A protein has these predicted regions:
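Generic N-terminal amphipathic, Lys/Arg-enriched alpha-helix
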Residues: 1-24
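Short polybasic/polar patches that bind polyanions
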Residues: 22, 39, 107
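Secretory-pathway/luminal and periplasmic proteins that interact with or process carbohydrate-rich
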Residues: 42-48
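Active-site cofactor/substrate anionic-group-binding motifs, chiefly glycine-
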Residues: 49-103
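Flexible, glycine/charged-enriched surface loops at secondary-structure junctions
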Residues: 25-33, 48-50
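Conserved catalytic cysteine-centered active-site region
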Residues: 101-114
Length: 116
């Protein structure tokens, strides 16, 4: 049995994934962020965290395991640290929020740590 490979360019694949997320009520920017991360994982050879997970995310969003429009909130915060409740967001979205907060803290205070 021979395997067939199909070349799929990154941008059309990203756009497809984004449309899937948007169809289940994920805001456009969050859909784009998540789609870009999935495709980049595949491009880096980390297939376990790539587009193959799209069905799992779709099912999780439909079943309420993940929330398409999460209400993320800061639980605790100091000048250099924060604890962020991701609100059952897609991990890529919550991770980006936490990373952005950590960078802002580091720019202001020299170091920043955020736990999501």
């Amino acid at each position: 049995m021979s395997e067939e490979f199909r070349i799929v360019w990154a941008e059309p694949l990203t756009a497809f994934c984004q449309k899937v997320f948007e169809k289940i009520d994920v805001p456009s920017q969050d859909a784009r962020t998540t789609s870009e991360v999935l495709v980049l994982a595949d491009l880096r050879g980390i297939d376990s965290h790539g587009v193959a997970r799209l069905r799992r995310y779709y099912t999780g969003l439909k079943n309420g395991v993940m929330v398409p429009k999460p209400k993320m909130k800061v639980i605790r915060e100091s000048p250099i640290t924060a604890l962020l409740d991701g609100g059952a967001a897609l991990g890529q979205v919550a991770g980006l929020k936490g990373m952005t907060m950590a960078i802002e803290k580091a720019m202001t205070n020299g170091v920043g740590f955020v736990s999501v």
